[in-house]
């Protein structure tokens, strides 16, 4: 059997209306991932309407109409293949209230595609998303300079847009010479899957080729097992079935597992993915697993499964590098917002503001600051108000990132540098 392609998760980021959905739709269309029956239905309609040329753009218009009528074609975890990878799209829509998704979603992304309108260039969310991608440790980025059809595929316009976004990327510490900047029209398909004859001046990769230039994600297989629990079901005739995504390590049928902070353990009787039984589950797999010896009431969303010889770390407190994205006043010691880490949401108290740092260089700007405000980056110590599992970002990267929410908004994003395990 041929070696299976590696999986890679890609977040689509960028300002609202710069064309993320259209670009995602175009990629799915070009790679044959929009279900045939949908295409077929639209082909028929196209013929009836006398649109002999069945164009993707028309498909996108129809999908958009259906979305506006509240019918979403379910492409939530959307996947497509390139020559080298299976790619899962972690879509990060543009509006402000999606920043939390971006933080919880993007922390699972191995790379990001920044979609930017060639006319509008850098907009507020363009900045915010680049800043966040950086903070969340997304080190690989592809820039799609979209809507080239609006400027007649003019190289000067492309260069101006590239220059504007490069400044920003450099500022937060991306190596701009390693980033592909691709002039595309998601609507017409230029340089998405096929090189466009409208941009003879561009000799870089298409978007599809650029995915194959990404480095595969760090091997999380060799790290300790961690499965944050999303839901727990009790299935008659089967038993207790926790559901979650394997973030690190490998789970095998027959393994003993322990759930923290619940402190209960059991034996894995079976594992299922996409309704198929499997013998072992790897990082990135969304699974349900039947555990003997554990009842549904013992565990809940936010608990984490691991192996007994290297159990998930329950912390007394943790030290983190944090960026304050927005706060109406200022953060001081004693502030207790909700920390969203993996699937857990737990109120944590700020117990120390240790230092303010320059987010770009990491240099200390101020020791023991009195307060933190919007835009500040800092090292802080947080104390969960109830037992919580979190790991150092250097030990298990996906388990060491978190978002801070309060008052219905995302206050900040951070990563765990150190921790004190609970005795």
From Swiss-Prot:
Enzyme Commission number(s) of this protein: 3.6.5.3
Superkingdom to which the source organism belongs: Archaea
G4: annotated span: 146-149
Keyword Metal-binding appears in the UniProt entry: yes
GO molecular function: GTP binding; GTPase activity; translation elongation factor activity
Annotated region (G3), positions in chain: 91-94
UniProt-annotated stretches for the region G2: 70-74
GO cellular component: cytoplasm
Protein location: Cytoplasm
Main location: cytoplasm
Segments of this protein annotated with the region G1: 14-21
Reaction equations catalysed: GTP + H2O = GDP + phosphate + H(+)
Keywords, sorted A to Z: Cytoplasm, Elongation factor, GTP-binding, Hydrolase, Magnesium, Metal-binding, Nucleotide-binding, Protein biosynthesis
Domain tr-type G: 5-221
Function, in words: GTP hydrolase that promotes the GTP-dependent binding of aminoacyl-tRNA to the A-site of ribosomes during protein biosynthesis.
NCBIfam families: EF-1_alpha, PRK12317.1, small_GTP
Family note: Belongs to the TRAFAC class translation factor GTPase superfamily. Classic translation factor GTPase family. EF-Tu/EF-1A subfamily.
Name assigned to this protein: Elongation factor 1-alpha
Source lineage: Archaea, Methanobacteriati, Methanobacteriota, Archaeoglobi, Archaeoglobales
């Amino acid at each position: 059997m041929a070696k299976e392609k590696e999986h890679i998760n890609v977040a689509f980021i960028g300002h609202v209306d710069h064309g993320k959905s259209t670009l995602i739709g175009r990629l799915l269309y070009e790679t044959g991932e929009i279900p045939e029956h949908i295409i077929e239905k639209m082909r028929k309609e196209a013929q009836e309407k006398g649109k002999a040329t069945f164009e993707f753009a028309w498909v996108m218009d129809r999908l958009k109409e259906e979305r506006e009528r509240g019918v979403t074609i379910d492409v939530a975890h959307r996947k497509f293949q390139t020559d080298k990878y299976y790619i899962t799209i972690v879509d990060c829509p543009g509006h402000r209230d999606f920043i939390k998704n971006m933080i919880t979603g993007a922390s699972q992304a191995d790379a990001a595609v920044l979609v930017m309108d060639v006319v509008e260039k850098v907009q507020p969310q363009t900045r915010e998303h680049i800043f966040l991608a950086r903070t969340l440790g997304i080190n690989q980025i592809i820039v799609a300079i979209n809507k080239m059809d609006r400027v007649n595929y003019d190289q000067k316009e492309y260069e101006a847009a590239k220059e504007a976004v490069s400044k920003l990327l450099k500022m937060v510490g991306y190596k701009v010479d390693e980033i592909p900047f691709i002039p595309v029209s998601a609507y017409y398909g230029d340089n998405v899957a096929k090189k466009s004859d409208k941009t003879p001046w561009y000799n870089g990769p298409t978007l599809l080729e650029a995915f194959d230039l990404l480095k595969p994600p760090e091997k999380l297989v060799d790290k300790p097992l961690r499965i944050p629990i999303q839901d727990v079901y009790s299935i008659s005739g089967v038993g207790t079935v926790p559901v979650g995504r394997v973030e690190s390590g490998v789970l095998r049928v027959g393994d003993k597992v322990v759930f923290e902070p619940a402190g209960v353990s059991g034996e894995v009787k079976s594992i299922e993915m996409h309704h198929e039984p499997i013998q072992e589950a790897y990082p990135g797999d969304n699974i349900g697993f039947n555990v003997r010896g554990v009842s549904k009431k013992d565990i809940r969303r936010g608990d984490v499964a691991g192996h007994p010889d290297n159990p998930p770390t329950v912390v007394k407190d943790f030290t983190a590098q944090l960026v304050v994205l927005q706060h109406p006043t200022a953060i001081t010691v004693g502030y207790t917002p909700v920390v969203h880490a993996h699937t857990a949401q737990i109120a944590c108290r700020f117990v120390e503001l240790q230092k303010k740092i320059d987010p770009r260089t990491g240099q200390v700007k101020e020791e023991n600051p009195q307060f933190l405000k919007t835009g500040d980056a800092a090292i802080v110590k947080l104390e969960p108000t109830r037992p919580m599992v979190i790991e150092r970002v250097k030990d298990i990267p996906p388990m060491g990132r978190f978002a801070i929410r309060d008052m219905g908004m995302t206050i900040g994003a951070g990563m765990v540098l150190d921790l004190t395990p609970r005795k």
